[in-house]
Structures are given as C-alpha cells and as structure tokens.
Amino acid sequence: ESVSGYKNLKHKDAMREDGSSTRQVIPFNEDYLGRMSESDREFFSLIKEVLDDERIGRKFFQLLLPGIQERKGKKKAEDIIAFPKSGLFCDASGYKIRPHKDVRTKLVTTQMYLPTDAKQESFGTSLYTRSIKGRIIRELNKISKTQRPEFEHLETFPFLPNSGYAFVVGDKSWHGREEIPEGMGNRYSLMNIYFEDKDVPFYD
C-alpha cells in the first residue's frame, strides 16, 4: 500500500526540467505524521520511536567510534551527544546526486534500504575519494569547457533487503548516487541522521 504526503526536495541534482523533483521525503515529525491516516501514523510513529532509541544511537557510535574520535577527540561512545532525525525517502528514476560529504551539522548519516527483492541491487549509494590530482582537476574544471572527473569511485553498497550503511560525516565522507535508470521502480529507504544540535531542521 502506498503512502501519501511526500514533500518534494528542491536539491539541484534532483530537479526535473518541469520543476518537479526526483527525490521526495516524509519527515517523521509531528506535522507530517499528523497528516497521515491513523494506521500509517501509528506505524511510522513506531518506526520513529525505534530510530530515536538511545540504544540504537549508542550502537552506531560504538561501531563508528574511530571516525567519531577523529572528528571529536578521544570520547567514549556513551559520552557522545547527538540528536536523531529520520524520514522515509522515495527516489524516482532520474534521481542522482553528485559526490558530497554532507554538512558538518550532521555527525552520523545512516540509510536503511527498503527494496522488496534483489532487482534493484545496483541502486545503492556509492563511496568516492578525491586525491590531490582530483582537487587540481576541480579548479581546472572551473575554467575549462572540457569537464574531467574529480572523484575516483570506491564501491557501491548493494541495495538489498535488510541492508544499508552508516558513516561519520567528515573531510573524506564523499558519497553520492549515479542516475537511477528508467523502468525499474522507485528507490525507497529510511534515513536516520544524528545531528550535533537538536534544533537543526530536517526537511521541516
């Protein structure tokens, strides 16, 4: 059964020529949950409750502790203070996003994939690296008509049931998504982002 009430995200990489967006989200906040049918609201409120659970965050922080310590110093996982915000994402064919690191207001980014089978296995998020050569190419691309690739592709997480990824946002957390092809359905996922400030908006 489909869920209504998605919000179009106006990210420049996601926009179609007609002004619509290939990426939509239902933020799990009081406003958007309140617009749902009673059954949907009950279901997604339960998901939000689980994702908000401190034990979930603590487990992520334990698994990602080396990266968190690199960013925040020699802290213990139980001493990390961060605020989870989550939502349901729908990416249509044509969606893409260039390699980016995520904004520094985010401490940890997590994404949980929701395919029904393995047909969309190639739809996962990709990781990249950019060397000194890549940074030079970036500057040359600003003045050249010929655009050369700045990034080297490292791997793509398989978009499979009961899978996903998590990473600490930092200077090298380059990730993105090549264009989703036509005719293979929408890409659904849950994202749960841990922010350092509880007042940062999450697609509100």
Positions of predicted regions on the chain:
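Catalytic core of non-heme Fe(II) oxygenases with the double-stranded beta-helix
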Residues: 40, 44-49, 57, 61-203
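Non-heme Fe(II)/2-oxoglutarate
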Residues: 1-63
